[in-house]
């Protein structure tokens, strides 16, 4: 086949494979466009979980008639014009791919009007060449996007959609995350004609805790400790739940934002977990809603197709900063609560040195302790002050927010007599669920670790293999399958075909979906860890392995796959090692307690120390 330029629709559909995973992906991209347009009200209408209709209506600035056709074209955007703009990006969108990708796998209609125009205009793309048609329409200032029949022209993708309830739950979760990021925007969500969520905008200086409670629940609000922490260009604000009262339900609340962009960043999660480690049980997770503000030049947001991940230029600095910010609030909580009256000379309190996998602590310097209000004591009406407008909070932020908490709780708990302390189990050591902190990388694939004064070497490829095996091994539910945009078709022998058919149920639990005919097998979906692998090599080797087996256990197959996956890292960096260890500690805690052979080797420094002393 000769080299040729792909038709626009096919090119957009390929891009949609990364951008548009499910209806929730469409909602996220379109709502972020509305926020970038300055909207203060966004109405979202969903039908049949988003498979039939997704309608996003906003009161933003709108799009000019002359730019409507461009809005549906690939790589057309108003957010950036040069590489310098990309490196300092503050808007949520910037690639100009979303609308083109969505319109290629659905029937998309874009209606918009700007304040300077007397009438609105409507645009839609159709045909193989994605020609855009523009016609007059009636519409107030703002934009409405209608997405009908998602994946109507890609049946394979539509087949992988879950139930209507499941898909809507994903949309609901996306809206929760966005509502937590933008307290100044009213967001209404309806499903099949019924209003499901109404998040009203909080006026400047208003009580953001009301919206926090509506989204995260009263249980989180009651245990929330407010954070305001700053160092240079870094600012951390938000709430973390008291680890001593964290429940499994609360542990599901883990929201972090970087410059207003919702993230699932492992480095941030690791720093928070390390700060709470000595107060959490072995199986507990922290609950938090945190906002990190950082110089846009110090973070790269262009590392994930859906912009779910970021890369910090100084990851160790960010890790230590977040760790110390969370730790300071938890340490303050241990102090005796003080009244709300201003303390003219607050006593300084030294923050203990932290233990983090990211390395040396840059922030363990004395900090001023803010008075912490008792959580259940009603405040006098005459002595209260309005909460400082978040995120531009003034000093004393935690004290002011304590007042808000008590006003929201309304019903104070009755005074109780102090109880004698109950015997408690000894707390786990802070390092009990951690390999230690990474000091440096040795010989490109080993991490030098320090834990409790002991030095050890960890083989990063071995840790990566154990992590892959944990990711591939099915638990209570099968591993999630990721559909391939272009299925892999392979020729197989009769023996190989028979083995595949016997192993089909086990492979399905691992997220591997295939279809076979007389002499061929077509791989239609694989689990996420396999998406970046060379399947042309891996799958034939897997089929050969299965042909030699008589028993097909998902665990054994997952172990074989993990051992045969190619590593993504030829030369490991500190940031990659920290991220890997955070994932291993979270998914494979048993490796910390009883490391298998070949993973961890202690380093005896006593001969070297003795030799130095003998000189």
Swiss-Prot record:
PROSITE patterns xrefs: DNA_MISMATCH_REPAIR_1 (PS00058)
GO biological process: mismatch repair
SMART domains assigned: DNA_mis_repair, MutL_C
Extent of Low complexity compositional bias: 378-391
Start and end residues of each stretch annotated as Disordered: 362-397
Keywords: DNA damage, DNA repair
Protein name: DNA mismatch repair protein MutL
Gene: mutL
């Amino acid at each position: 086949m000769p080299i040729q330029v792909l038709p626009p629709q096919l090119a957009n559909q390929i891009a949609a494979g990364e951008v548009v995973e499910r209806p929730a992906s469409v909602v996220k991209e379109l709502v972020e466009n509305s926020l970038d347009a300055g909207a203060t009200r966004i109405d979202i209408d969903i039908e049949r979980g988003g498979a039939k209709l997704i309608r996003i209506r906003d009161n933003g600035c709108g799009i000019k008639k002359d730019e409507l056709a461009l809005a549906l074209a690939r790589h057309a955007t108003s957010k950036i014009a040069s590489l310098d703009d990309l490196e300092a990006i503050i808007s949520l969108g910037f690639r100009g791919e979303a609308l083109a990708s969505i319109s290629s796998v659905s029937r998309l209609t874009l209606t918009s009007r700007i304040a300077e125009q007397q009438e609105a205009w409507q645009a839609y793309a159709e045909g193989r060449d994605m020609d855009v048609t523009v016609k007059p329409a009636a519409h107030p200032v703002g934009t409405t996007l209608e997405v009908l029949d998602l994946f109507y022209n890609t049946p394979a993708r539509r087949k992988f959609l879950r139930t209507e309830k499941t898909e809507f739950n994903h949309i609901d979760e996306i809206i929760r995350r966005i509502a937590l990021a933008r307290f100044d925007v009213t967001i209404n969500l309806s499903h099949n004609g019924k209003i499901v969520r109404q998040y009203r905008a909080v006026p400047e200086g208003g009580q953001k805790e009301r919206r926090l409670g509506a989204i995260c629940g009263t249980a989180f609000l009651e245990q929330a400790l407010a954070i305001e922490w700053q160092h240079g260009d870094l600012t951390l604000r938000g709430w973390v739940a008291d680890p001593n009262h964290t429940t499994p339900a609360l542990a599901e609340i883990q929201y972090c934002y970087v410059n207003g962009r919702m993230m699932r960043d492992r480095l941030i999660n690791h720093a928070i977990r390390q700060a709470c480690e000595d107060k959490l049980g072995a199986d507990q997770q922290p609950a938090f809603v945190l906002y990190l503000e950082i110089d846009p030049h110090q973070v790269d947001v262009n590392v994930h197709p859906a912009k779910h991940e970021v890369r910090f230029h100084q990851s160790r600095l960010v890790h230590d900063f977040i760790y110390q910010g969370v730790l300071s609030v938890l340490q303050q909580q241990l102090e005796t609560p003080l009244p709300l009256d201003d303390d003219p000379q607050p006593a300084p309190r030294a923050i203990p040195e932290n233990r983090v996998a990211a390395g040396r602590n840059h922030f363990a310097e004395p900090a001023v302790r803010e008075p912490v209000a008792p959580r259940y004591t009603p405040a006098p009406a005459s002595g209260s002050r309005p909460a400082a407008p978040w995120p531009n909070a003034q000093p004393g932020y935690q004290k002011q927010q304590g007042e808000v908490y008590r006003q929201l709780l309304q019903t104070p708990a009755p005074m109780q007599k102090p109880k004698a302390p109950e015997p408690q189990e000894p707390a786990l050591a802070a390092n009990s669920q951690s390999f230690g902190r990474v000091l440096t990388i040795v010989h490109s694939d080993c991490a030098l670790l320090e834990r409790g004064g002991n030095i050890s070497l960890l083989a990063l490829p071995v840790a990566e293999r154990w992590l892959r095996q944990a990711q591939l091994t099915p638990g209570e539910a099968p591993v999630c399958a990721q559909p391939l945009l272009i299925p892999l078709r392979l020729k197989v022998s009769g023996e190989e075909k028979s083995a595949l058919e016997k192993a089909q149920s086990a492979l399905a639990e691992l997220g591997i979906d295939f279809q076979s005919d007389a002499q061929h097998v077509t791989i239609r979906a694989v689990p996420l860890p396999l998406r970046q692998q060379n399947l042309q090599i891996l799958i034939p080797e897997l089929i050969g392995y299965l042909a030699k087996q008589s028993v097909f256990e998902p665990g054994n197959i997952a172990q074989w796959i993990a051992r045969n996956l190619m590593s993504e890292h030829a030369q490991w960096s500190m940031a990659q090692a920290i991220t890997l260890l955070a994932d291993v500690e979270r998914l494979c805690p048993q490796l910390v307690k009883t490391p298998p052979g070949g993973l961890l080797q202690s380093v005896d420094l006593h001969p070297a120390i003795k030799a130095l002393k003998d000189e």
